[in-house]
Curated annotation (Swiss-Prot):
The lineage of its organism: Bacteria, Pseudomonadati, Pseudomonadota, Gammaproteobacteria, Enterobacterales. Keywords: Cell inner membrane, Cell membrane, Membrane, Transmembrane, Transmembrane helix. This is UPF0266 membrane protein YobD. The chain crosses the membrane at residues 6-26, 45-65, 67-87. Belongs to the UPF0266 family. The gene is yobD.
Length: 152
């Protein structure tokens, strides 16, 4: 097993750990889930480039008669990338004392202001930064507003 294979195993393990945390652990942290809203995906061009580069590496490994384990590890990495970028749905998870956005816990007390932009993006001004929340269904913005008002 080469250093390349070890690095591939490390990346596959990291992506698998992230997927397990995102799907199973995060919804159970910090109390029961009050509301989970699916969000719009960001630009997919990065994911196309990532998976495309992995496919090029697989092709290069096969044509140069590289190690079979490397081909399988590259294929597993491409599948993990496909799952994370195209199958997994990003979401915002609201709890009793705060919410998870982009896998980061944010307490309601940190929200200084909330605005709704013309194109349906909820803007939350925090102490240090601004969150732009793009929901998949515009009707979910009303659910978010009602939940935040009722918990404050």
């Amino acid at each position: 097993m080469t250093i390349t294979d070890l690095v591939l195993i490390l990346f596959i393990a990291a992506l698998l750990a992230f997927a397990i945390y995102d799907q199973f652990i995060m919804p159970r942290r910090n109390g029961p889930t009050l509301l989970a809203i699916p969000l719009l995906r960001r630009g997919r061009i990065d994911s196309v480039i990532f998976v495309g580069l992995i496919v090029i590496l697989i092709y290069n490994n096969v044509t140069n008669h590289g190690a079979l384990i490397t081909t399988w590890l590259l294929s597993a990495l491409a599948l993990m990338g496909f799952y994370i970028f195209w199958i997994r749905v990003p979401k915002i998870i609201f709890k009793q004392k705060g919410f998870f956005f982009a896998n980061v816990w944010i307490e309601y007390s940190l929200i200084k202001a909330m605005n709704l932009s013309e194109d349906g993006v909820l803007v939350m001004q925090l102490e240090q930064r601004r969150l732009l929340i793009r929901v998949r269904n515009i009707d979910n913005l009303e659910k978010i507003y009602k939940l935040i008002v009722s918990t404050q």
